[in-house]
Swiss-Prot record:
EC number: 6.5.1.2
Top-tier EC class: ligase
Organism: Escherichia coli O1:K1 / APEC
Pfam families named in the record: DNA_ligase_aden, DNA_ligase_OB
Coiled-coil stretches: none
Entry's family note: Belongs to the NAD-dependent DNA ligase family. LigB subfamily.
Functional description taken from the UniProt entry: Catalyzes the formation of phosphodiester linkages between 5'-phosphoryl and 3'-hydroxyl groups in double-stranded DNA using NAD as a coenzyme and as the energy source for the reaction.
A GO biological-process term: DNA replication
Identification of the protein by name: DNA ligase B
An example Gene Ontology molecular-function term: DNA ligase (NAD+) activity
Entries under Gene3D superfamilies matching the protein: DNA ligase/mRNA capping enzyme, Helix hairpin bin, Nucleic acid-binding proteins
Keywords, ordered alphabetically: DNA damage, DNA repair, DNA replication, Ligase, NAD
Catalytic activity from the UniProt record: NAD(+) + (deoxyribonucleotide)n-3'-hydroxyl + 5'-phospho-(deoxyribonucleotide)m = (deoxyribonucleotide)n+m + AMP + beta-nicotinamide D-nucleotide
Lineage per the UniProt record: Bacteria, Pseudomonadati, Pseudomonadota, Gammaproteobacteria, Enterobacterales
Active site: K124 (n6-amp-lysine intermediate)
């Protein structure tokens, strides 16, 4: 009873999450968006199944197909499974291909495993499914998966794949096998290399007219032997003896979802002879083959890997002004998971770069993680029917603007506060962008150092700042007064590296104000252009005003 309640709760949670992400479209807009994507996927299907070519990455195709299904559910016009291939095959399968149900996560897999025994895990090899029919010890027929009941006659093609045994003996002499034709790889690490569009490459080779030597780059992984030996160990042994050795090598007994997760993670990082996109867990006990039907396999499930790249919907385009005045563009996304990281924003770059990408709210973009786990845009994979792009702010900012607060300076002013509080500048622990925004909104700072005047009571009464944190912040602000002169100058945005500033031996504001352009050119890593920037900076009226204010606060190095 508890198991069924858990399953019911899971279904309800899934339905709730599905409803929550339905687009806020009018019926007419929904019809247009669904129709456009449906036509594109149909075109990709035709290219893939009729001509053996693919204009889209496998992962992008899968995710956009899932997105289409989601939209159809949202607006009540579900049709057939868009991933079902055209019904061109005329050859009946001796045993139907059932397909495999996908598990959403480890918890769902655990629920499924709880009521079953004698379970085994195999890699979910990424290729194209095939039926191999042996009669009197010889390969009699090879049939593509097709719609699960009928497929194409691939016999002549498969006979040219040297890795597929053409003759067998013993229990396999008169047998029907189901498996995956895959692209042979040497030391393929899924975590690092991804899917490499393996499925489309295999389909292309099998669909191509004429015979090709490149078929020898293919092999087969047998994952089912309908009506074979009852014991999995016997099945694996007989398959290995017949030449299907990979099945025995990559089939392991498992007792629970933790063990499956361990193997799944191992294969995700290991060097394998094929591309995979997850694992399949199957029960050794299977029904008689005459009961096998497409979409009705209850004895096996798949737990796929999180894609290396995810298709994400752009919810909004936002503009940010950095401390130097440069405008950057950020895309807010419908949340996606990448390597256990929830990604909701991705930096596009400059306004020019955004215009080159041509990204608008409603578009679907491919996102992955670059070095140090930073999200990046790989491609725009689908553009919406209605595209309205926001107007970027005027480029009125530079490295000498927004030291003092104003309505037009809001973003650059906040960026300056975030910068001066960072570890490499004044080291104000415990406060980031959200905290600075809360303080500025409540206390209306005049300039970037106004926080030095905040009292413990003011901090304690700031909405968004926990009372337990306010005392810590006040302590941090007071400690900042003891920071060396060079740190304060860096907080003011002097256009120098810390190394160049330290080498200059400037230890007071008055000394720095009297420095010359020639003096700065003599410092390491400081050319004539940078030296001129320093002079412009120290002669700026806002900078001089800040220097005088810090002197009044008796900050070290600024005293008269």
């Amino acid at each position: 009873m508890k198991v069924w309640m858990a399953i019911l709760i899971s279904i309800l949670c899934w339905q709730s999450s599905a409803w929550a992400v339905c687009p806020a479209w009018s019926p007419a807009r929904a019809q247009e968006e669904i129709s456009r994507l449906q036509q594109q996927i149909k075109q990709w299907d035709d290219d893939y199944w009729k001509e053996g070519k693919s204009e889209v990455e496998d992962g992008v195709y899968d995710q956009l197909s899932a997105r289409l299904t989601q939209w159809q559910r949202c607006f009540g016009n579900e049709t057939r499974d868009v991933m079902m291939p055209p019904l061109n095959g005329a050859v009946m399968h001796p045993v139907a291909h059932t397909g495999v149900r996908k598990m959403a996560d480890k918890n769902a897999l655990s629920l499924w495993m709880r009521e079953r025994s004698d379970l085994w895990v195999q890699p979910k090899v990424d290729g194209v499914a095939v039926t191999l029919v042996y009669r009197d010890g010889k390969l009699n027929k090879a049939i593509s998966r097709g719609n699960g009941l009928k497929g194409e006659d691939w016999t002549q093609k498969v006979r040219l794949i040297s890795a597929v045994p053409q003759t067998v003996s013993g229990p396999l002499a008169n047998s029907t096998l189901q498996g995956e034709i895959f692209l042979q790889r040497e030391g393929h690490i899924q975590q690092q290399m991804g899917g490499i569009n393996a499925r489309a490459k295999v389909a292309g080779l099998m669909m191509r007219q004429g015979n090709s030597d490149t078929l020898n780059s293919l092999a087969v992984f047998v994952w089912a032997w309908p009506d074979g030996p009852h014991l999995m160990t016997d099945r694996l042994k007989d398959l290995a003896t017949a030449g299907f050795t990979l099945t025995q090598t990559y089939t392991r007994a498992v007792k629970n979802a933790d063990e499956v997760a361990h193997v799944r993670n191992e294969w995700w990082k290991a060097k394998l002879p094929f591309v995979t996109d997850g694992v399949v867990v199957r029960a050794a006990k299977e029904p008689e083959s005459r009961h096998w039907l497409p979409g009705q396999a209850e004895w096996l499930v798949a737990w796929k890997y999180q894609p290396v790249a995810q298709v994400a919907e752009v919810k909004a385009i936002q503009f940010a002004v950095g401390k130097s005045g440069k405008i950057s563009v950020v895309a807010s996304l419908a949340p996606v998971m990448l390597d256990d990281k929830k990604v909701q924003r991705v930096n596009i770059g400059s306004v020019r770069r955004w215009q080159e990408w041509d990204i608008a709210p409603g578009d679907q973009i491919l996102v992955s993680l670059a070095g140090q786990g930073i999200p990046r845009i790989d491609d725009v994979v689908w553009r919406g029917a209605e595209r309205t792009k926001p107007t970027p702010p005027e480029n009125r900012f530079n490295s000498l603007t927004c030291y003092f607060a104003s309505d037009v300076c809001q973003e650059q002013f906040i960026s300056r506060l975030v910068w001066l509080g960072s570890k490499q500048v004044l080291g104000l622990d415990g406060i980031g962008e959200a905290g600075w925004r809360a303080l500025h909104q409540t206390h209306r700072f005049e300039h970037i150092f106004s926080w030095l005047l905040l009292t413990p009571e003011q901090l304690q009464n700031t909405p968004g700042i926990a009372k337990s944190k306010s005392a810590q912040l006040w302590h941090q602000f007071n400690l900042a007064r003891q920071q060396p002169f060079t740190r304060w100058v860096m907080a003011m945005g002097i256009p120098l590296t810390r190394a160049a500033l330290n080498a200059s031996d400037e230890r007071s504001w008055s000394q720095l104000l009297f420095s010359t352009e020639q003096f700065w050119q003599q410092q390491p890593g400081t050319g004539s252009g940078r030296a001129r920037q320093v002079i412009e900076w120290k002669e700026n009226a806002q900078i001089k005003k800040l220097g005088s204010w810090l002197a009044a606060q008796q900050i070290t190095g600024f005293e008269p």
